[in-house]
Design a protein with these regions (language model features):
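Short S/T/G/P-rich N-terminal loop/turn motif that feeds into the first structured element of a domain
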Residues: 1-99, 105-112, 129-250, 261-280
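A common structural junction motif
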Residues: 118-124, 247-253
């Protein structure tokens, strides 16, 4: 899992720290503070680099050793989503390995965890295993309820229900919009697209696990992000049917592509998925 100390240098081996957002996390007044969901995109080294001659393990194995469950519990935080990346469909060529979401009770609790001795002792494993990471602080975004959208269909009744060979998948969209200063405001072009896409996706069993507006990227590569959306489908085949729908494709070309300036879209297989209940 990917966390960090925002008070240190501007750059760590796996990304660049945004100190302005780190200061916001540390200084938000208690009356204005509240839960924050830290959304982690993780790319591992093939072999962990400890730098001390330690026997070689994979970057993923090093991250498993790092996972700071006890430190999280001590500050009231918990892992609400953990998934392996099955495929990166859209992006800049980075083949992400894992996506995780940690819910913190407050922004300040995120900072407090970084100072814990037990957390700092574990950090050596993350530093050794992580090649690149993006960590985005998000808050829940209202999901539009258009009156003309069809009701969600039970998975047992969709054309491509989950099977033993093709179970549920989560599709995550990490979005940067053109000229949007407020991540909570979805551009009008995107609103048109998402309404049309919902007409198709809901018939194939779409369940929205959570939409988040990005209030800051605490570790990354300098790019700003606006929204992160998690969509669950009963099977990969169900998602593919949505992708290939002609009407959805037409709306993508006319509206979605003009609204988005940068994105990652990934198919995930989750081992922990309490995301929807964590937002309620």
């Amino acid at each position: 899992m990917s966390e960090h100390d925002p008070r240190g240098t501007d750059r760590v081996r796996y990304g660049t720290i945004n100190h302005e957002y780190g200061l916001k996390l540390a200084t938000t007044e208690p009356g204005d503070d509240g839960p924050v969901w830290m959304i982690n995109l993780m790319k591992y080294r093939e072999v962990a680099e400890y730098g001390d001659g330690s026997a070689g393990i994979s970057g993923r194995e090093a991250d498993d050793r790092y996972m700071p469950v006890e430190s999280l519990r001590a500050v009231g935080a918990r892992i609400v989503f953990l998934a392996d990346v099955e495929e990166v469909l859209l992006g800049d060529g980075v083949m992400w390995d894992r996506v995780a979401v940690v819910k913190y009770p407050t922004r300040r609790s995120f900072i407090e965890m970084q100072s814990r001795p037990d957390f700092r002792r574990q950090h050596v494993h993350k530093d050794a295993g992580m090649q690149q990471t993006i960590v985005i602080g998000g808050v829940p975004l209202s999901i539009p309820k258009s009156t003309d959208e069809p009701a969600a269909v039970q998975w047992s009744k969709v054309p491509h229900p989950p099977t033993g060979d093709d179970g549920p998948v989560v599709v995550v969209h990490v979005l940067q919009f053109h000229d949007v200063d407020d991540a909570a405001n979805t551009p009008s072009e995107m609103q048109v697209y998402q309404s049309a896409a919902a007409q198709v996706a809901l018939q194939h069993g779409l369940r929205v696990s959570g939409w988040f507006s990005a209030e800051g990227t605490i570790v990354g590569d300098g790019r700003p992000w606006h929204q992160i959306r998690f969509h669950t489908f009963p099977s990969r085949r169900a998602f593919v049917e949505v992708v290939q729908d002609p009407d959805r494709l037409a709306h993508q070309k006319e509206f979605r592509d003009s609204a988005i300036s940068d994105t990652y879209t990934m198919i995930l297989r989750a081992s922990i998925d309490d995301l929807a209940s964590s937002v309620d």
